[in-house]
Amino acid sequence: MARYVGRFAPSPSGPLHFGSLIAALGSYFQAKANNGIWLVRIEDLDPPREMPGASQLILEALKAYQLHWDGEVVYQSERHGLYQAQIDAWLDNGDAYYCQCTRKQIKEHGGFYPGTCRDKNLKEGAIRLKMTKPVARFLDQKHGMIEIPEQLVNEDFIIKRRDGLFAYNLAVVLDDIDQGVTEVVRGADLIEPTGRQISLYQILGQPEVSYLHLPLAMDDNGNKLSKQNHATAIDIENPKPALLHAMTFLGFDVPEEIKAASMNEILSWGCENWRLEQLPSEIEITPRFSNGTV
């Protein structure tokens, strides 16, 4: 049986906040409870959205919380050659094509791309992958079978944007394959692209990974804690309170004697007592798909 390989893959749009700590802890506990390895990958694909120095702040925060990763940190900004080579191969054999449709035009079709440019033989624009392996549902390790809207299932999706930036779905799958990831543990806000990512595994002829989506931390206004919503950075000078708060959020009932222990002892206890059944069953946010419908 292959060894468990998990990962935490934040984007450097700001320092770690409580919501991203949940994702880091959940992926860490799941990996270590399965006697696996835990990788860290910085998903710096979108420079306009990134904050200078955020990558280092994220790594420093993980160290402060005693979340020590295995191996070297991988940066997506250093892996463009991998992504472009795959795109070129698809373009050469006709599995991908250029598209010049605008967001307005797609919105006029209900928010889903109907394949307008598939047979136009254009030479520039965004690049879309022909959907030859549609995935209508997938099994989440906590939430069971997740159904995906039919229009989204069959959509030829973008793998490289018209501005030259590589699409998240392509990069994350190529990296997970390259790094040998066996299970993806992340926030429930990323349920939406999972079907497309499974399609990519199938198109690439690669064994699929399993998925576990963690409940999301919300603010008082019902918005997901995120850098875009100006979520407060976690305290790295006195990390224990936030660590214990995050563990409670993940369903742990931490004994008083463990609360008084060192950070390493708390994390070791967490690895020994991690159970998927203890996770809150609520996703905390309704998964929303491309056209704004559930």
Swiss-Prot record:
GO molecular function ontology, one term from the record: ATP binding
Cofactor(s), by name: Zn(2+)
Positions annotated to bind ATP: K227
Known EC number: 6.1.1.-
One GO biological process term: tRNA modification
Keyword Metal-binding: yes
Pfam families reported for this sequence: tRNA-synt_1c
Textual note on the cofactor: Binds 1 zinc ion per subunit.
Sequence motif: 'HIGH' region, positions: 10-20
Entry keywords, A to Z: Aminoacyl-tRNA synthetase, ATP-binding, Ligase, Metal-binding, Nucleotide-binding, Zinc
Example of a GO cellular component annotation carried by this entry: cytosol
Motif segment ('KMSKS' region): 224-228
InterPro entries: Glu-Q_tRNA(Asp)_Synthase (IPR022380), Glu/Gln-tRNA-synth (IPR000924), Glu/Gln-tRNA-synth_Ib_cat-dom (IPR020058), GluQ/Sye (IPR049940), Rossmann-like_a/b/a_fold (IPR014729)
Family: Belongs to the class-I aminoacyl-tRNA synthetase family. GluQ subfamily.
NCBIfam families per the UniProt record, alphabetical: PRK05710.1-3, queuosine_YadB
HAMAP family, sorted: Glu_Q_tRNA_synth
Role noted for this protein: Catalyzes the tRNA-independent activation of glutamate in presence of ATP and the subsequent transfer of glutamate onto a tRNA(Asp). Glutamate is transferred on the 2-amino-5-(4,5-dihydroxy-2-cyclopenten-1-yl) moiety of the queuosine in the wobble position of the QUC anticodon.
Name of the molecule in the record: Glutamyl-Q tRNA(Asp) synthetase
Organism the protein comes from: Vibrio parahaemolyticus serotype O3:K6 (strain RIMD 2210633)
